[in-house]
């Protein structure tokens, strides 16, 4: 079951060492049959996806080294969750502190801040960081739809800004020169442009039987596959 701020790791899921790519350490690995593939844009949406970026940022640093960059538009960045998850596997507090320092956080509060950061500032940060011995290998954007409101912006402007963000995240994912391996984004409500530009899209929802389920909405070979979480 997916709770408010995290996905609960499930027993019986294959270990990360038996998979390839960036894993979730929960049943989403079973849905995909593997982890997130390199140089892909993965999109997760639904009311119950809160917490995914925290876990992916943690697992990226833990399994692939380097750094993770968390763009928090949904106010869901949870260092305590990350600390708890890392401590479950690493009792060494020094190692945990080092891991936490490897996850950079940028908070945005408006749709224009998010658009400007993703389209202008983030590419510049990634370009500079690509020269580092510990480059950013994961970029995650949480709660993208949370900073958009039709009360503040006309629908046409919202559509245009979301399209620009989706295009740029897709470009970042495909650009091997920036040394970013994985890009993921979440929203509570479905954003059509993110769906169009993503390589993998997963909807997490509550079924009529009051159970949490995940469905592959976009995938090159497994589209339509569903599991109970």
Task: Show the residue positions of the predicted features.
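The Walker A/P-loop phosphate-binding site
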Residues: 1-91, 95
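Well-ordered, non-membrane alpha-helical segments in soluble/globular domains
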Residues: 117-122, 155-169
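Short, well-ordered alpha-helix to beta-strand connector turns
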Residues: 39, 65, 100, 177, ...
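Catalytic-core regions built around general acid/base machinery
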Residues: 56-60, 164-175
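Phosphate-binding/switch region of NTP-binding enzymes
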Residues: 170-229
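Conserved inter-motif catalytic segment of the P-loop NTP-binding fold
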Residues: 69-150
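Residue-level preference for the first positions of well-ordered beta-strands
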Residues: 39-43, 67, 136-140, 179-181
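Hydrophobic/aromatic beta-strand patches that form the interior of the parallel beta-sheet core
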Residues: 42-44, 69-71, 104-106, 181-183, ...
């Amino acid at each position: 079951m997916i709770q408010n701020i995290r996905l609960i790791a499930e027993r019986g899921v294959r270990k990360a060492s038996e998979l390839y790519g960036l894993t979730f350490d929960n049943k989403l690995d079973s849905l995909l049959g593997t982890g997130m593939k390199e140089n892909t844009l993965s999109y997760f949406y639904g009311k119950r996806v809160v917490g995914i970026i925290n876990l992916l940022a943690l697992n990226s640093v833990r399994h692939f080294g380097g750094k993770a960059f968390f763009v928090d538009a949904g106010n869901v960045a949870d260092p305590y969750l990350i600390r708890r998850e890392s401590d479950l596997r690493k009792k060494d507090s020094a190692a945990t502190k080092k891991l936490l320092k490897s996850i950079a956080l940028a908070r945005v509060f408006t749709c224009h801040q998010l658009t400007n950061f993703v389209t202008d500032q983030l590419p510049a940060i990634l370009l500079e960081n690509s020269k580092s011995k510990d480059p950013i290998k994961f970029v995650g954007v949480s709660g993208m739809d949370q900073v958009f409101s039709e009360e503040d912006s006309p629908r046409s402007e919202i559509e245009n800004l979301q399209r620009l963000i989706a295009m740029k995240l897709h470009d970042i994912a495909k650009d091997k020169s920036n040394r970013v391996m994985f890009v993921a984004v979440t929203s509570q409500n479905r954003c059509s442009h993110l769906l169009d530009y993503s390589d993998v899209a997963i909807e997490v929802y509550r079924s009529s039987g009051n159970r949490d389920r995940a469905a592959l909405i976009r995938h090159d070979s497994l589209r339509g596959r569903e599991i109970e979480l």
